[in-house]
Amino acid sequence: MCIRDRTNTYELTNDMSHLEEKEIFLESTSSMVFDRVNRIVYAGISPRTNAVQLIIWCRHNNYELVLFETESHTGSPIYHTDVLMYVGTEIIGICFDVITKEHRDYVKEKVSTYHDVVELSPEQIEKFCGNAIEAKNKNDELYLILSSTAYKALNEEQIEKLLESYTNIIHSDIPTIEKYGGGSARCMLTELF
């Protein structure tokens, strides 16, 4: 099902689908990690995250852009920004080690301006620790949602720090999504709530 089929459910405000034919991509909430409170978009450049389209999108929507390059253990850029980081109301989880040295200090400064930081290791993001998402219940209590694979990869100190910002950490075992889909909890929820 393509985006045009969704227009009867969601209002299409900016159709960029024509760029697909030119293999220019900006894969929304996977390519762009949003700090909606402070109107900042964090994005790592990759074949799925076109820098020019990202700049245009941020200008059009009045978001500050924090653009950086990444390098995975294979030497390639990390395909989606939501693999290496998530943004919550009070806290950000991020793997600085996969951000190139030229951009690392800049990103560290930006993320720590408005948030506490939980640093993730490259091994932890391979276990989907960066692919988490914050949600709020009807009582305005904040929760962090991630997979059981990710939860088990967090250390005790990280869990304690997260529980200072969250009522609880919700996790579920989703190995099929992680193995065959290449994503985890955040990819499944995609901020459509």
Which residues does each PLM region occupy?
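The feature marks the mature, well-folded catalytic cores of soluble enzymes
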Residues: 4-193
